[in-house]
Structures are given as structure tokens and as C-alpha cells.
């Protein structure tokens, strides 16, 4: 190079805003802190450029996503960046459209000038193999999830770890006990009896903890909701007046201070004290009923508030709890409405097989917790643990036959000796459970009444009625009689009319209105069967002709009455309280009930020579499903702590089905059954393993086949948050004359690409005979002729169709760059809602000078939109001041009332009680200069973790939050590490707040090409 040329080059470089000669390092980072993604999300990719010797030049970045059969290439024009303190730094926020990328392993490479970086990523489908929920609750975290998912043990919903391994395992997630302390199951918050769920100081604190936990994994694409807490119940505490026989204060669920406060707020008068209410008078009983029916709203109110918060995390987020175990604990707040406000009814059995009806207890609790909530999904975990394969089958299948929408297993493990049984049950539930996905519970011919008024009539005494229901339920199992549990509201509002008979047992009092309604039912076409121990006169009722007393009352009680030694008494109880003894005790009751029902021409769905075969009966349109579960008693279980449970054993049984002209299909095998016919019906000789299940499907007409319509592919790249490329398919179940069988039948749907590779292998079901399904395809899927094969899983018939797919060659919507400040997509609607709802806000700024200038700009920006803002320095905002009353039960993410150290006044840390923020707040700064943002970062509630390179020099970040800074505190966040970045963040916040959207959600790349292998 001659001297003149050299001088000209040096002069030219000096004139440029940044130094092109400086060495530039380029690094790929993933703001979601993972390299495993799903096909239903925007994949965030940040490109960090840096130079230790000057600024950064503008130029073209090439981003390449290379997989096994395709390569996608994008180019972006990146700006230069001037040096600060001699160093150059820039972070550019790019995104890939996961909706348009097929599952697989890819290498992502970024190149600009002579600098490059690459990273391997994995993308998995968000479409689950089965639409039935197969649930793992209390699961481990991280790599310990390996082998638990769809291709392993078979779970597709996970309550436990929320890490990226859940995506690899193809499971949706909810977390576990987000409101619980370290996942502990508690009736009251952190087991503090002072903290009742009727108390807003308590439940708002619980919601704060639940939101902090839920927000920590909200960017996971497989997060479908937040599991909040297990076994919440209204508290019992020392009563100020009630005393035990020895004169000591008694523990009671009545007259809890927060409940009395709420009652007075509602009725403008003091709630009567429990010890002053005389239930022997009509007026006293009416007052007692009014107090306790009002009390039944507390848990429901708590869940309303919880759901309202959780659903703000992301669209469709489910608020979940465990609300079924205490179905008859009226004074603990449990009735049909206790979780009415939640989108899913979820819970577990009452300590499984260790109480009540022993082997039958898990399904008993399930069926009696279902009344009046059958229009929504039910996810149920029958027991807490297991010890044999037979026990696990029995609990799971007895619950499955009720027609619930999700079946949860206890602490399963790939290393468990029962892993094969777990997998077997999950496979059955995945294949066949699709017929139950749409809640459509069958109203059984026989109903069993659970009486609320009988419990209220006993005040604080023990009602016999609930215990008697144990024996009635077991009797119906022994007589192959499926039942529907009903409550008094079902009797009063006419719901009972959907049944042919109702059994009333063990009651000593019924509300007169209920008696009248039962009499009307009996006067019509209904049958009211009353056991002889019922002391209520119901006109028109049919006397059973025998008592239905609880086994504990009729047998165990008298046997131990003369034993004075407590340990000896307990030992005798354990000796007598076994499932074997209960079955023998209940058999006469089952026989008599069966005789009475037969007299009324109410027959079971099948007959059998082995009475320990339980029956399930579900009707879905023109298809009847008859389910049989073997609970024949085998040997005594191990370990011995599960007292009274008897291990299920094998059975050879003859089952006779009605000869009603319908064909019979083995739904577990997928073929028609040829049964022998005799005068009693169609006979099947079957071998059952312990706890085993058989399922017979009986459509109105023989199945002829499956007709598959030609699939239609639709491409619409303008779609946001949904698949831009969709394949619509429909399959119809028909009889041998090609008429639609209008029912719900299980299907297997397999979609293959032109090379024969399986793209989808799914279990779904028809609805009214038709299964309509929309599946996403990707821009880089293989072009050519695709096939769809549909198999009906009842008869094994198949149908097939094909369609043509042409992959995209150019689609800039596959990638894009953030327009201005970074924000998480699901926060957008919440930010807009904040601006529409709030009229007064506080702006809490960090210590850096640029925050104050940005805040003043924000005050000016907000004023025309009727929002008045006040600026405060975040570090000067004190902790919330608590009164004595508040401090006693104040709860939060790290607090549970005075017993946890919460004190009156301002002595508490803001991390415990929140800040004194009378208005919603907009927080400006960084975690390093703003104490509020520091707490948010510590609790991991921000969608992205801010640091020196994120959002990066000159960039800002905007986020939304609820509850972290205090009870019900709504917050918006602007984070930036310099003035330019904060200016950008405030501007973006303004745009989001007033609804000023760019024409396209992302800035498109300069070019985009897609190469797909032939």
C-alpha cells in the first residue's frame, strides 16, 4: 500500500462514527434462559456485539437455522454503536417464529463480518399425543423429570418441576403448591391456625406467593396454569366460650374473627355466637343454617380472587387447587361450591385407602365431591401412595370409570418397581380417556343423597349420615349399580328428576322443603328408597326393610366399648376395621338394595357371578360404555401402615350384558366380541387380574368404518399467536350403511409426510360421530403428498386420506427484530389494561439521574390520558404500616402472621409486607439502583433477567407485575442501564399503554430464504 492510499484510508476511518478496524466479538444468547423450545412460542434470540477497542460498525447480520432436512437463512441490517469509555457494545433482540418451524434439532448460527457464534437448540411440538389429561403430581425437578413424559411413563401434565426438561418430555406444567411453603400441604396458610382463608390479609398474601411463583415460569410455553395449594380448609381455633368436658377451652371451626367480621360487613349486624344458637327451635336452626351457608362462600371467594390473578399471567392460565378430599367437611368450608369459581375441579382422595371404605375410599371420595360441578373438567388423584401393582390399578381404574377428564398418579418414578404398571395405566387412559375429555357425565339411574341440613341439625355433634354413606356406596359396588351423588340443592331445583331413584340413608333430619321435594319425586315417576334407620317421614318413600348403619357404629363401637386401655382399644379397632370385614358386613345391604331396585325394574348395566366386580356406565350419544373393575380381595397388604386395606386379587368372572340388539366391542383391544347368548343375555367369561378393568363399547349399530375427509391446508402468515399454516381434517364414524354413529368414540390419528415419517400420532375422540381437528404445519415441512390415517379404537376399522403440501421458500415472518424496548408478549394486554383502569399512579424511580428525567417525561405523557402521576424515590418509600389487627394474620410470600415474626407498625421489611404504595406503581431503573426492581429480580418474577448485556446499551425493557410489591399492587416496570435505553422503555410503555401498535409486531428481516430437502 503506497503512502497516499494509506493516508486516505486512515482519514476515511477517522470520519466514520464507529471504528471499523476494531475487533468485534459476537455472541448468541437466549433471554428465556433455555435452548429447548416449543412450536407455540416466539423464540427469543439476542445477538450481543462487543469490542474492547472502539465502537461497533453497522452491517449485515446473517442468521442461519439449519436442521436435518432444512436450512433457513435471514439477514438483518444492524446499526453501529459508538464507543463508551473506549468500548463498544450493542445488543440486538431477534426472534424466530416457533409456530412456523417443525420439531427437531437445529444449529443456529449468527455471522457478521468476521465474527460469528452458534448454538444448538431443540424444538418440540406443543400438540399432546392424547387430549386426556394423564397427570403426574408432586413430580421432581430438572433432569429427574427424564423418562416421565409421553414417550416414557406416559404423563402429559406435570405438577412439579418447571424446567426445560418438561418440554423435552412433552409435558405441560403447572408447578406445585405455589402458595404452599416449600410445597408443604397445609389446611391453613403455612399451618398457622390464626390464618383463615376468609381473611383478606391471609388470602391476598397467599395470592402474592402464588403469583410470585407462577410468574417465575410464565415464559415456559408449556405452562398451562398454576397449581396453588393442596387441602385448603377454613380454620379451627380455640373458641372464646366453648369448653370441653374438663373445662378447658375447646377448638372449634366456629366464630373465627375474620368470619365474624365478614358476616357483619354483609348483614350490618353481629353474627350470633355458636354457643348462643339453639338449634332445637326453628328460629335457631334457621339462624344456624344462615350463618353456615354464608360461611360456605369463603373458599369460593378466595378462589375467585386467585383465578382473577392467575389468568392475568397468560391467556387461558388455569388456577388449580386440591379441593376434593374434604367433600363432607361443611364447617371447613367444603361443599359443592367450594371451588366453583375455578376452571377445573382437582384434588385427591381422603388419604386414599387408609380410611372410610378402605379399598373403595378413593372412588367414594371422588363421586361424592362431584355434585353440581360436572360442566367442567375434573382431575383426580385417587390416593397418596401405593405398594402393589394391583392396588394402583384398582385406585386408578375405579376413578377412571366415573368419566372424569384427568387421572393423576401419586409419586411415580422411572426407577420405581411399578413403572411398568404406571405406564400401562397411562397408556389405557391416553387411548380410551379421550371419550371423557368433553365433560358429559351420565346421570345414573340411581342417586344417593348427601344431606347438608342433617349436618347442620347436629350443630357441633357428630352426624351419622356421612358415615352411613360409606356402607351405601360399598353396597352399590357389590351390586354393580353405578350411582350419582346428589345434594339437597339437586332435590330442590329439579335436577333429581334426571334419575329414576334416590337412596336416603342415615339421616335424622331433613329440611322441610327437601322433604316436600322428595315427596313430589316419589309421587311422580321417581323412587325414594329410605333405610330403616332414617327418622324422617318422607311421604311416598319405599322402605328398604333394613337399616344402613355405618360399620363403625354398628360393629366396632360396641366391640370396643368395654375396653378401657386406649392402646388396646385402638388395636382392636385396627383388627376389626378391614376391607374384608366391611364387605361381609355390607353384603346383606347390597342384596336388599338390589331386590328393591329390581322390584322397581331398575337393573344394573351387567350381571356377574362375582359380586366384587364394580360397574361403571357412561353414555356418550349413541354409544354406551360399560366398564368393569375387579376389586376381589386377595391378601393382606404391605406395608402395614395402610390399615384395613386388602390387596386386590385375580378373579374369573362371568359377566352377562343385556341382549338389546347392540353389538359389543372390547374397547381396550379394539375389536368386536362374539358373545354366547342365553336367556339372561350375552355372556362373557373373563379373567381379571387384581384391580383390572374391562371396557365394553355398545354403539346403537355395528361400526362400519371411518370416513376421512380430504384435509385442507390453509396458509395465513398474518396470524399472531396461532399457527400460520394449518391443516384441517375431519373423520366420521359410520355404521355399515355409512350412516353416522352419533356418539363419542376413541380414535388414533396418524399424519405422515411424503417420506413416511410420522409427523403426528394422536389419540382423540369423535363428538356426535365426527372428529374435527386442526393441526399446525411448518414452513420447513417436507413438500409432496401427505397421508392421514384414522383408526377407530373400538372396532379397529381404518380410514385414510391424502393432501398436498408445498413448503414455503420465502417467508420473512419466520423471524424478526424487536421494534424498540423488549417486552414479553403476554404482558402487552396487561399493560394496556393498566392504563385503561388506573387514574392515579406512583412512579418509583431508581437512584440513577436518567430515571428522574424519564419519570418527569412520563408524568407529562400520562396527563392527557386522565392519569395523574406522582414521582417518588424508590429507596425512600417505607414499608407498609400495619395495625395490630393486620399484623396478627398478615401473610405474604415470606410471611404468615405474627407467629412468623410480622409486627405492627413499620418495623417490617418491605419484602415481608410490601411498600407503602397507595396507588398502582410504575417502577423505573435497574435492579442495581432500585430496591423494588431488586426484589423483583430476586423473586424471578420478571420475564427476562436484566444484567449488563440485557436489555443492552441504549435499549430498554418493559414488564408487568401483580402482587410482588404488596397486596394487590399492580406494577409496570421500565428497566434500562442508560438514558437512551430508559427513553426507549418509556416510549414503548406509552405505545403499549394507549394501544399504538406498529403495523407488524416485529421488524422483518431484510431477506429470508427456506431450503427444504426433497
Regions found by a protein language model. Name each.
Residues 116-123, 707, 711, 761-763, ...:
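Edge beta-strands of extracellular beta-sandwich domains
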Residues 118-172, 811-833:
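An acidic-aromatic substrate-binding cleft motif
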Residues 132-141, 187-207, 283-300, 325, ...:
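The substrate-binding groove and active-site-proximal loops of carbohydrate-active enzymes
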Residues 144-213, 298, 302-311:
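Aromatic-lined substrate-binding rim segments of carbohydrate-active enzymes
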Residues 194-200, 204, 209-362, 366:
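Polysaccharide-binding and catalytic clefts of secreted carbohydrate-active enzymes
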Amino acid at each position: 500500500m503506497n503512502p497516499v492510499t494509506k493516508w486516505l484510508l486512515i482519514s476515511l476511518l477517522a470520519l466514520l462514527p464507529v471504528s471499523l478496524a476494531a475487533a468485534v466479538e459476537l455472541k448468541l444468547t437466549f433471554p428465556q434462559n433455555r435452548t429447548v423450545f416449543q412450536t407455540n412460542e416466539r423464540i427469543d434470540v439476542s445477538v450481543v456485539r462487543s469490542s474492547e477497542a472502539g465502537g461497533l460498525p453497522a452491517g449485515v447480520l446473517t442468521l442461519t437455522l439449519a436442521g436435518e432436512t432444512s436450512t433457513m437463512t435471514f439477514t438483518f441490517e444492524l446499526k453501529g454503536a459508538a464507543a463508551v469509555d473506549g468500548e463498544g457494545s450493542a445488543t440486538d433482540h431477534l426472534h424466530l417464529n416457533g409456530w412456523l418451524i417443525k420439531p427437531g434439532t437445529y444449529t443456529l448460527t449468527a455471522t457478521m463480518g468476521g465474527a460469528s457464534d452458534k448454538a444448538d437448540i431443540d424444538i418440540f411440538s406443543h400438540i399432546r399425543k392424547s387430549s386426556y389429561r394423564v397427570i403426574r403430581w408432586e413430580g421432581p425437578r430438572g433432569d429427574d423429570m427424564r423418562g416421565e413424559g409421553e414417550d416414557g411413563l406416559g404423563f402429559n401434565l406435570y405438577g412439579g418441576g418447571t424446567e426445560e426438561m418438561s418440554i423435552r418430555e412433552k409435558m405441560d406444567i403447572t408447578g406445585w403448591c405455589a402458595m404452599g411453603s416449600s410445597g408443604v400441604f397445609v389446611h391453613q396458610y403455612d399451618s398457622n391456625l390464626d390464618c383463615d382463608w376468609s381473611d383478606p390479609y391471609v388470602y391476598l398474601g397467599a395470592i402474592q406467593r402464588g403469583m410470585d411463583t407462577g410468574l417465575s415460569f410464565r415464559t415456559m410455553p408449556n405452562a398451562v396454569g398454576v397449581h396453588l395449594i393442596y387441602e385448603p380448609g377454613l380454620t379451627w381455633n380455640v373458641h372464646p366460650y366453648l369448653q370441653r368436658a374438663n373445662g378447658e377451652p375447646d377448638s372449634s371451626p366456629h366464630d373465627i374473627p375474620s368470619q365474624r367480621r365478614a358476616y357483619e360487613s354483609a348483614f350490618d349486624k353481629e353474627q350470633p355466637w355458636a354457643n348462643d344458637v339453639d338449634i332445637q327451635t326453628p328460629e335457631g336452626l334457621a339462624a344456624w343454617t344462615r350463618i353456615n351457608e354464608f360461611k360456605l362462600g369463603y373458599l369460593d371467594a378466595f378462589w375467585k380472587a386467585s383465578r382473577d390473578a392467575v389468568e392475568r399471567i397468560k391467556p387461558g392460565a388455569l388456577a388449580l387447587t386440591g379441593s376434593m378430599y374434604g367433600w363432607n367437611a361443611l364447617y371447613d368450608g367444603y361443599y359443592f361450591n367450594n371451588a366453583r369459581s375455578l376452571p377445573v375441579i382437582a384434588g385427591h382422595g381422603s388419604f386414599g385407602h387408609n380410611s372410610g371404605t378402605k379399598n373403595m375410599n378413593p372412588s367414594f371420595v371422588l363421586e361424592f365431591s362431584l355434585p353440581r360441578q360436572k360442566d367442567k373438567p375434573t382431575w383426580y388423584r385417587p390416593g397418596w401412595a401405593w405398594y402393589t401393582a394391583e392396588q394402583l390399578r384398582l385406585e386408578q381404574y375405579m376413578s377412571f370409570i366415573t368419566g372424569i377428564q384427568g387421572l393423576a398418579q401419586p409419586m411415580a418414578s422411572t426407577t420405581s418397581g411399578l413403572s411398568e404398571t404406571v405406564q400401562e395405566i397411562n397408556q389405557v387412559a391416553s387411548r380410551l380417556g379421550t371419550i371423557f375429555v368433553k365433560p358429559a357425565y351420565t346421570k345414573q339411574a340411581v342417586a344417593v343423597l348427601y344431606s347438608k341440613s342433617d349436618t347442620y341439625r347436629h350443630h357441633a355433634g357428630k352426624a351419622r349420615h356421612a358415615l352411613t354413606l360409606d356402607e351405601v356406596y360399598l353396597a352399590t359396588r357389590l351390586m354393580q349399580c353405578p350411582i350419582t351423588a346428589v345434594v339437597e340443592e339437586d332435590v330442590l331445583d329439579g335436577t333429581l328428576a334426571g334419575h329414576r331413584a334416590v337412596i336416603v340413608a342415615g339421616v335424622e333430619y331433613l329440611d322441610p322443603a327437601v322433604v316436600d321435594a322428595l315427596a313430589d319425586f316419589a309421587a311422580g315417576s321417581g323412587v325414594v328408597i329410605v333405610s330403616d334407620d332414617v327418622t324422617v317421614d318422607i311421604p311416598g318413600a319405599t322402605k328398604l326393610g333394613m337399616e344402613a348403619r355405618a360399620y363403625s357404629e354398628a360393629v366396632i363401637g360396641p366391640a370396643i366399648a368395654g375396653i378401657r386401655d386406649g392402646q388396646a382399644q385402638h388395636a382392636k379397632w385396627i383388627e376389626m376395621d378391614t376391607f374384608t370385614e366391611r364387605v361381609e358386613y355390607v353384603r346383606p345391604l347390597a342384596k336388599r338394595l338390589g331386590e328393591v331396585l329390581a322390584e322397581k325394574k331398575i337393573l344394573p348395566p351387567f350381571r356377574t357371578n362375582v359380586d366384587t366386580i364394580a360397574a361403571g356406565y357412561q353414555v356418550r350419544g349413541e354409544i354406551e360404555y360399560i366398564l368393569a373393575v375387579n376389586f376381589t380381595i386377595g391378601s393382606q397388604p404391605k406395608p402395614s401402615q395402610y390399615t384395613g386395606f386388602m390387596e386386590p386379587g385375580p378373579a374369573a368372572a362371568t359377566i352377562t350384558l343385556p341382549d338389546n340388539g347392540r353389538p359389543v366391542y372390547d374397547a381396550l383391544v379394539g375389536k368386536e366380541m362374539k358373545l354366547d347368548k342365553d336367556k339372561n343375555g350375552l355372556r362373557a367369561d373373563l379373567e381379571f387380574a387384581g384391580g383390572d378393568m374391562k371396557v365394553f363399547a355398545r354403539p346403537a349399530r355395528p361400526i362400519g368404518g371411518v370416513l376421512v375427509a380430504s384435509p385442507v391446508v390453509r396458509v395465513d402468515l398474518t396470524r399472531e399467536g396461532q399457527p400460520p399454516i394449518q391443516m384441517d381434517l375431519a373423520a366420521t364414524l359410520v355404521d355399515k350403511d355409512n350412516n353416522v354413529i352419533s356418539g363419542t368414540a376413541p380414535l388414533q390419528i396418524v399424519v405422515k409426510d411424503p417420506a413416511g415419517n410420522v409427523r403426528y400420532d394422536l389419540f382423540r375422540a369423535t363428538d356426535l360421530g365426527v372428529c374435527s381437528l386442526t393441526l399446525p404445519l411448518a414452513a420447513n415441512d417436507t413438500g409432496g403428498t401427505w397421508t392421514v390415517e384414522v383408526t377407530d379404537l373400538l372396532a379397529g376399522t381404518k380410514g385414510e386420506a391424502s393432501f398436498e403440501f408445498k413448503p414455503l421458500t420465502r417467508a420473512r415472518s419466520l423471524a424478526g427484530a424487536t421494534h424498540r424496548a423488549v417486552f414479553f408478549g403476554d404482558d402487552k394486554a396487561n399493560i394496556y389494561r393498566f392504563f385503561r383502569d388506573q387514574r392515579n399512579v406512583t412512579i418509583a424511580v431508581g437512584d440513577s439521574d436518567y430515571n428522574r428525567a424519564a419519570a418527569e417525561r412520563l408524568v407529562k405523557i400520562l396527563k392527557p390520558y386522565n392519569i395523574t402521576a406522582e414521582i417518588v424515590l424508590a429507596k425512600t418509600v417505607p414499608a407498609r404500616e400495619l395495625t395490630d389487627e393486620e399484623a396478627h394474620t398478615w401473610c405474604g410470600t415470606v410471611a404468615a402472621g405474627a407467629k412468623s415474626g410480622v409486627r405492627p407498625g413499620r418495623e417490617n421489611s418491605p419484602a415481608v409486607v410490601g411498600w407503602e404504595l397507595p396507588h398502582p406503581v410504575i417502577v423505573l431503573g435497574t435492579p442495581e439502583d432500585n430496591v423494588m426492581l431488586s426484589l423483583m429480580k430476586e423473586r424471578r418474577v420478571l420475564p427476562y433477567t436484566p444484567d449488563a448485556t440485557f436489555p443492552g446499551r441504549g435499549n430498554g425493557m418493559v414488564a408487568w407485575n401483580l402482587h410482588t410489591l404488596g397486596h394487590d399492587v399492580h406494577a409496570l416496570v421500565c428497566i434500562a442501564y442508560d438514558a437512551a435505553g430508559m427513553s426507549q422503555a418509556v416510549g414503548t410503555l406509552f405505545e403499549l399503554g394507549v394501544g399504538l401498535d406498529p403495523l407488524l409486531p416485529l421488524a422483518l428481516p431484510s431477506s429470508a430464504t427456506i431450503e427444504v430437502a426433497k
